Amino acid sequence: MTHRFNHISFLTDYGTRDEFVGIVKCVVADIAPHVQVIDITHDIPAFDVRAGALALARAVAYVPKGVVLAVVDPGVGTARRSIAVSVSG
């Protein structure tokens, strides 16, 4: 079964001084041009997974139905665990 969503809510520790947020949004636009990307924040302190989780918890009540992409990366290229959650309702 294929799910089709119209929104991606986007939270990162990337900051906005460089091109990384823009690159992710360009890739999304290329893959799914119908999708609106909603920026929650990109100013989570670097590598601070707890701060990212707290920001997401505060925002989730306002996030529209769709996909939430949260990236707080403890180090590019390092061994780390990913989390994927599916919520219905």
Task: Name each region found by the language model.
Residues 1-89:
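Charge-biased, low-complexity intrinsically disordered regions
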